[in-house]
Amino acid sequence: MYEAVYAHPDGDSTVARHALTAADSEYDGIVVRNHGDEQADYDADAISDAYGVDVAAGIEVRADDPSRASGFVGNYRSDRTVVVVHGGDRRINRFAVEQPTVDVLAHPMRDDGDFNHVLANAAADNGVRVEFDFGPVLRASGGSRVRAIKELRKLRELVENAGAPFVVSASPSTHLQIRAPRDIIAVGETIGFDADTVREGLTEWGQIVERNRERQSGAVIEPGVRLEDDADDAE
């Protein structure tokens, strides 16, 4: 299972500190999902070797309109393992779920964002994961927490009905906000998610990383078609 983190300068903790806490929390890896204007400077391989967790380079595209978002996605797709689109705007939500090159639509219900069955079906058709962001449930209180729970339940129902793919995250911006998978699963169960759904959502980040690394390596010509090494042919 993986967690997707915001590291310094987009958060308060370095990538290395996030990785250490993730390892202690029994994650297999982290995705560094900083926004494009606040990217982190880090050596993923060195950190991975030091702490025994995978460190995947991601990006969270944040834009005011779909045309700019499209340009950013195109710019980052070839060199980032995970491409996330910062949701919460109705136009951006729609753009993201209609783009097969987008891996994840993040927090689509945030701010004045909305998500409906049409967008859920588009996400299913294009293989775009919808994020269940548990961060507000873990960190908000009072009316804000109640609203966050209500929005997550609505989002879960839409995603389930459409059969759309999804990820789960606590969206930590500091290592102190990282919660162990068992804790996130427990929180999910208290707000109406079953344990298997939360576990699947945490695992899906790693599936994205594995699939995209394979594609970037050139081993995949098109979905379902792989290049085999000469060594394999010789066996």
Curated annotation (Swiss-Prot):
Disulfide bonds: none annotated. Keywords: Cytoplasm, Endonuclease, Hydrolase, Nuclease, tRNA processing. The keyword Zinc-finger does not apply. InterPro entries: Pol/histidinol_Pase-like, RNase_P_comp-3_arc, RNase_P_p30. GO terms for molecular function: ribonuclease P activity. It is found in: Cytoplasm. It catalyses: Endonucleolytic cleavage of RNA, removing 5'-extranucleotides from tRNA precursor. The keyword tRNA processing applies. GO terms for biological process: tRNA 5'-leader removal. It comes from the Archaea. Signal peptide: none annotated. SUPFAM superfamilies: PHP domain-like. One of its GO terms (cellular component) is ribonuclease P complex. Its EC number is 3.1.26.5. It is an enzyme of class 3 (hydrolase). It holds the Pfam family RNase_P_p30. HAMAP family: RNase_P_3 (MF_00756). Belongs to the eukaryotic/archaeal RNase P protein component 3 family. Part of ribonuclease P, a protein complex that generates mature tRNA molecules by cleaving their 5'-ends. Consists of a catalytic RNA component and at least 4-5 protein subunits. This is Ribonuclease P protein component 3.
